[in-house]
Amino acid sequence: MKVGILLVTHSDIGKQLLLTATSIFGKNPFRVELLSVDNYDQPNDVKELAEKYVKFLDSGAGVLVLTDIIGTTPSNIASSINHDKIKVVAGLNLSMILNVFNYPENSLNQLSIKALEGGIQGVSKI
Protein backbone atom coordinates (compact mmCIF):
# COMPACT_ATOMS: atom_id res chain seq x y z
CA MET A 1 0.00 0.00 0.00
CA LYS A 2 1.26 3.43 -0.96
CA VAL A 3 0.16 6.79 0.27
CA GLY A 4 -2.03 8.69 -2.18
CA ILE A 5 -1.36 12.32 -3.00
CA LEU A 6 -3.88 15.09 -3.61
CA LEU A 7 -2.74 18.49 -4.87
CA VAL A 8 -5.20 21.26 -4.01
CA THR A 9 -4.08 24.51 -5.62
CA HIS A 10 -5.12 27.73 -7.27
CA SER A 11 -5.88 27.27 -10.97
CA ASP A 12 -3.36 25.03 -12.74
CA ILE A 13 -0.45 25.47 -10.32
CA GLY A 14 -0.65 21.86 -9.16
CA LYS A 15 -0.95 20.51 -12.69
CA GLN A 16 2.12 22.38 -13.89
CA LEU A 17 4.20 21.44 -10.85
CA LEU A 18 3.22 17.78 -11.21
CA LEU A 19 4.05 17.76 -14.94
CA THR A 20 7.43 19.37 -14.27
CA ALA A 21 8.25 17.07 -11.35
CA THR A 22 7.32 14.00 -13.39
CA SER A 23 9.49 15.22 -16.27
CA ILE A 24 12.48 15.84 -13.98
CA PHE A 25 12.03 12.65 -11.95
CA GLY A 26 11.28 10.52 -15.00
CA LYS A 27 8.11 9.02 -13.55
CA ASN A 28 5.39 9.58 -11.00
CA PRO A 29 5.77 6.95 -8.26
CA PHE A 30 2.43 7.77 -6.61
CA ARG A 31 -1.25 7.77 -7.34
CA VAL A 32 -2.00 11.49 -7.62
CA GLU A 33 -5.13 13.55 -8.18
CA LEU A 34 -5.27 17.26 -8.92
CA LEU A 35 -7.89 19.65 -7.64
CA SER A 36 -7.71 23.13 -9.15
CA VAL A 37 -9.61 25.86 -7.34
CA ASP A 38 -10.71 28.88 -9.35
CA ASN A 39 -12.27 32.12 -8.13
CA TYR A 40 -15.69 31.14 -9.47
CA ASP A 41 -15.76 27.78 -7.63
CA GLN A 42 -18.02 27.30 -4.62
CA PRO A 43 -15.86 26.19 -1.65
CA ASN A 44 -18.43 23.66 -0.40
CA ASP A 45 -18.58 22.02 -3.83
CA VAL A 46 -14.78 21.84 -4.00
CA LYS A 47 -14.59 20.40 -0.47
CA GLU A 48 -17.09 17.69 -1.44
CA LEU A 49 -14.98 16.82 -4.48
CA ALA A 50 -11.79 16.84 -2.38
CA GLU A 51 -13.32 14.34 0.04
CA LYS A 52 -14.27 12.09 -2.88
CA TYR A 53 -10.71 12.25 -4.20
CA VAL A 54 -9.30 11.40 -0.77
CA LYS A 55 -11.56 8.35 -0.46
CA PHE A 56 -10.52 7.27 -3.96
CA LEU A 57 -6.80 7.76 -3.26
CA ASP A 58 -6.67 6.07 0.14
CA SER A 59 -5.65 2.46 -0.33
CA GLY A 60 -5.22 2.09 3.42
CA ALA A 61 -1.97 4.03 3.85
CA GLY A 62 -3.61 7.46 3.90
CA VAL A 63 -3.42 10.55 1.74
CA LEU A 64 -0.92 13.40 1.70
CA VAL A 65 -2.61 16.64 0.66
CA LEU A 66 -0.31 19.32 -0.68
CA THR A 67 -1.63 22.84 -1.12
CA ASP A 68 -0.13 26.12 -2.19
CA ILE A 69 -0.67 29.16 0.05
CA ILE A 70 -1.70 28.74 3.68
CA GLY A 71 -4.84 30.63 4.65
CA THR A 72 -6.32 30.75 1.15
CA THR A 73 -9.33 28.88 -0.20
CA PRO A 74 -7.37 25.81 -1.42
CA SER A 75 -5.56 25.36 1.91
CA ASN A 76 -8.72 26.04 3.90
CA ILE A 77 -10.54 23.38 1.88
CA ALA A 78 -7.62 20.96 2.30
CA SER A 79 -7.50 21.45 6.06
CA SER A 80 -11.25 20.89 6.37
CA ILE A 81 -11.30 17.50 4.62
CA ASN A 82 -12.93 14.94 6.89
CA HIS A 83 -10.84 11.76 6.74
CA ASP A 84 -8.99 9.68 9.34
CA LYS A 85 -5.69 9.18 7.51
CA ILE A 86 -4.75 12.55 6.07
CA LYS A 87 -1.87 14.99 6.44
CA VAL A 88 -2.00 18.46 4.90
CA VAL A 89 1.14 20.44 4.03
CA ALA A 90 0.93 24.00 2.68
CA GLY A 91 3.53 25.98 0.75
CA LEU A 92 3.70 23.67 -2.26
CA ASN A 93 6.71 24.09 -4.51
CA LEU A 94 8.61 21.94 -7.00
CA SER A 95 11.27 20.96 -4.47
CA MET A 96 8.55 19.66 -2.14
CA ILE A 97 7.07 17.37 -4.79
CA LEU A 98 10.48 16.10 -5.90
CA ASN A 99 11.46 15.28 -2.32
CA VAL A 100 8.21 13.36 -1.78
CA PHE A 101 8.77 11.47 -5.07
CA ASN A 102 12.08 10.18 -3.66
CA TYR A 103 10.30 8.29 -0.86
CA PRO A 104 7.39 6.31 -2.36
CA GLU A 105 7.54 3.59 0.32
CA ASN A 106 7.42 5.96 3.30
CA SER A 107 4.47 6.19 5.66
CA LEU A 108 2.04 9.10 5.58
CA ASN A 109 3.68 10.73 8.58
CA GLN A 110 7.16 10.31 7.12
CA LEU A 111 6.04 11.71 3.76
CA SER A 112 4.54 14.78 5.41
CA ILE A 113 7.94 15.43 7.00
CA LYS A 114 9.70 14.89 3.66
CA ALA A 115 7.27 17.34 2.05
CA LEU A 116 8.12 19.98 4.66
CA GLU A 117 11.85 19.36 4.33
CA GLY A 118 11.72 19.53 0.53
CA GLY A 119 9.65 22.69 0.56
CA ILE A 120 12.05 24.42 2.93
CA GLN A 121 15.13 23.25 1.00
CA GLY A 122 13.66 24.75 -2.17
CA VAL A 123 13.58 28.27 -0.75
CA SER A 124 16.78 30.27 -0.57
CA LYS A 125 18.15 33.75 -1.08
CA ILE A 126 20.64 33.63 -3.95
Describe every region a protein language model picked out.
Residues K2-L64, I69-I126:
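N-terminal loops that bind phosphate or other acidic moieties
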